[in-house]
Amino acid sequence: MGTRAIVSDANILSGLESNATGVTAFSMPGWQLALWATAYLALVLVAVTGNATVIWIILAHERMRTVTNYFIINLALADLCMAAFNATFNFIYASHNIWYFGRAFCYFQNLFPITAMFVSIYSMTAIAADRYMAIVHPFQPRLSAPSTKAIIAGIWLVALALASPQCFYSTITVDEGATKCVVAWPNDNGGKMLLLYHLVVFVLIYFLPLLVMFGAYSVIGLTLWKRAVPRHQAHGANLRHLQAKKKFVKAMVLVVLTFAICWLPYHLYFILGTFQEDIYYHKFIQQVYLALFWLAMSSTMYNPIIYCCLNHRFRSGFRLAFRCCPWVTPTEEDRLELTHTPSLSRRVNRCHTKETLFMTGDMTHSEATNGQVGSPQDGEPAGPICKAQA
């Protein structure tokens, strides 16, 4: 069976020759290349530095090692690798239209982008599920550390399986003396296999998880925002606990919306290309692709900024991480925020949450007399509370 080269993430630009100039139709002026290189370099530096800092903040401070934050580590790791590998090397390939990096890295370049995207969005989905159980069903058993690690490993394995077809059909070709890294799909009567693959990828790593997260965060929002705190406790630990949960949910909703907005044009671009493949041969397509690819890759750099702006513990962590900078002055409060164990008074106050939820109609009497309440404040280690209550 014959094969034909199909445009994909690693072979988006074909090696068309210009009859007038003798150079590739996708050559660009040096000043334009310099602007794009600056934009991509800034993206990679911000994404790698920000996500590496997020990983350090969680791993270096025991108080930050929660189930939710382990999924955030997984998300940050996928984003860091996406920026360091996919954004960097694919930009060089798309801007020069020559593959410089050999056959082995061609396989990797067609395997890793889909893998990282899957890991990113399903880490967000796992966070949404964890928050849903903690807030909507606070008395159900929470994920243990081994279960969390198993889920993370499962996400990576499924992601690799989903990306494997592109890796399997990857190959190196030489066109007019220029080396290309392409995905050569089997000839399947008009590219039906390619269209099916793109649609499956779109559903599994975009539409379906976004739909699940939309439903989860809608229920979480309704649960939190209808929850009232009795007037005599309106300025106590219960109110702070509720406000912390709301702020964390807002941050994660913003993370999900950012991902959705950044990646939608990129997905639509490839789906459109399966119906009208000739668009890839227009001269302007290089600039369109570089813009859409930059927008998609930029999703890797926004999350650390969101965490820093909307979460006080991550903000303290960033101050500590960049304390060598002259304009950053961490305080003792920042250090205590990440290392200090909550005081006994705060733990006792949190014990009264059961009574508060029962008084506001958020739980039944049987729920108010058994089990634990909710989840710890964002960033605090989960642990038994109220055991001494009689």
From Swiss-Prot:
A lipid is attached at C324 (S-palmitoyl cysteine). GO terms for cellular component: plasma membrane; sperm flagellum; sperm head; sperm midpiece. Keywords: Cell membrane, Disulfide bond, G-protein coupled receptor, Glycoprotein, Lipoprotein, Membrane, Palmitate, Receptor, Transducer, Transmembrane, Transmembrane helix. Residues 1-32, 91-107, 171-196, 273-290 are extracellular. Glycans are attached at N19. Disulfide bonds join C106-C181. InterPro entries: GPCR_Rhodpsn, GPCR_Rhodpsn_7TM, Neurokn_rcpt, NK2_rcpt. CDD domains: 7tmA_SKR_NK2R. One of its GO terms (molecular function) is substance K receptor activity. Residues 365-390 are annotated as: Disordered. Residues 57-69, 130-149, 219-251, 311-390 are cytoplasmic. It is a multi-pass membrane protein. It holds the Pfam family 7tm_1. Residues 366-375 have a biased composition (Polar residues). PANTHER family: G-PROTEIN COUPLED RECEPTOR TKR-1-RELATED, SUBSTANCE-K RECEPTOR. This is a receptor for the tachykinin neuropeptide substance K (neurokinin A). It is associated with G proteins that activate a phosphatidylinositol-calcium second messenger system. The rank order of affinity of this receptor to tachykinins is: substance K > neuromedin-K > substance P. This is Substance-K receptor. The gene is Tacr2.
